[in-house]
């Protein structure tokens, strides 16, 4: 029962935090939002409705068999060991592809035409991420946010449960967010009677 309490209570707290954070973010996205209409894929499920649909029609049943691989990007070196599977969904915004990759869950920005690496960001969290994290590898993906006036950010969660905001153009952490671009999602999560969970070994729930 104690293990259940550790997982469920923090998950509820994180959900409330996530909804509050997202409501503020969405409120600031009234204009200039990317869309699948121009050939891009700006969100994990395409759009806020989760449609998973693109209106593009250049690829269809008649020409699908003629498609060829344009380029490949290997992620073997993005972590202490190679990753055997990739379950995340890359996004494409304003002519740039963003994805999480490798066993350290790095964030990469690629030129969609050539596959050229534009920037990469990763965090070495030690055993908190490699030994104690229940969900490792590259994860399911990341998010893009903009205020519509030039401030563009990539948002993701590390394997060690840290929420990170990066400058979408440079890959540098946003200094004004949390502590130099990072919010430790374990800090402030308690079990029992006001007992802070172990920041290294403590396990919390996290859902999109």
Labelled PLM ranges:
Residues 1-12:
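Bacterial N-terminal signal peptides that target proteins for export
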Residues 20-30:
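Signal peptide processing junction and immediate N-terminal pro/mature segment
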Residues 29-80, 116-131, 172-199:
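Aromatic (tryptophan-biased) beta-strands that constitute blades/sheets of beta-rich domains
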């Amino acid at each position: 029962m104690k293990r259940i309490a550790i997982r469920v209570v923090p998950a509820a707290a994180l959900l409330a935090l996530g909804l509050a954070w997202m409501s503020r973010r969405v409120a600031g996205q009234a204009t200039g939002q990317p869309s699948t209409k121009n050939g891009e894929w700006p969100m994990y499920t395409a759009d806020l409705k989760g449609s998973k649909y693109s209106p593009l029609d250049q690829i269809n049943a008649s020409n699908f068999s003629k498609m060829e691989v344009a380029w490949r990007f290997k992620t073997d070196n993005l972590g202490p060991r190679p990753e055997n599977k990739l379950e995340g969904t890359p996004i494409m915004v304003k002519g740039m592809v963003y994805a999480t990759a490798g066993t350290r869950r790095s964030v990469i920005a690629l030129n969609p035409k050539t596959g050229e690496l534009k920037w990469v960001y990763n965090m070495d969290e030690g055993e908190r991420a490699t030994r104690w994290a229940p969900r490792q590898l590259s994860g399911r993906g990341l998010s893009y946010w903009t205020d519509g006036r030039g401030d563009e950010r990539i948002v993701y969660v590390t394997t060690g449960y840290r929420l990170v905001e990066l400058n979408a153009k440079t890959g540098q952490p946003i200094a004004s967010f949390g502590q130099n671009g990072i919010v430790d999602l374990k800090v402030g999560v308690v079990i029992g009677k006001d007992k802070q969970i172990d920041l290294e070994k403590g396990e919390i729930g996290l859902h999109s």
